[in-house]
């Protein structure tokens, strides 16, 4: 079926295909990554994200992100979460490996407020990454 991303969970299976990426990424500081995210001028909105990170507690927390006039601000908040994801899903979203909707369908992101989906879809674009390494 088109869009079926079940293969993302098959890494430990004996009878499945395997993915062998040549590059891996991880957002070490999610708050700083959000500060550096380029935002299109026409994207505006806000959402409260609950980010969880099993390995780096610095990244755990509720963040309210606001985009307007080509800038993104983020701040810790005590508001109810509207979107929940772990650091792995955030990294895939941030680098454009998968779109917001693809990660929702794969159950990597949980949406508590569907009205925020359009904003996050516009903020994080799926793209092809070209990585150059120079030694």
List where the protein language model places each region.
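Intrinsically disordered, low-complexity, positively biased terminal segments
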Residues: 1-135
């Amino acid at each position: 079926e088109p869009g079926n991303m079940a293969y993302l969970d098959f890494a430990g299976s004996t009878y499945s295909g395997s993915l062998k990426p040549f590059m891996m990424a991880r957002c070490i500081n999610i708050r700083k990554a959000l500060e550096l995210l380029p935002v299109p001028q026409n994207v505006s909105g806000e959402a409260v994200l609950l980010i969880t990170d099993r390995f780096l507690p610095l990244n755990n927390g509720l963040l309210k992100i606001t985009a307007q006039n080509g800038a993104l601000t983020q701040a810790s908040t005590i508001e109810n979460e509207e979107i929940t994801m772990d650091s792995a899903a955030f990294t895939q979203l941030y680098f454009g490996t998968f779109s917001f909707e693809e990660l929702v369908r794969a159950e990597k992101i949980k949406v508590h407020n569907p009205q925020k989906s359009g904003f996050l879809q516009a903020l994080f674009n799926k793209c092809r990454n070209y990585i150059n390494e120079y030694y």
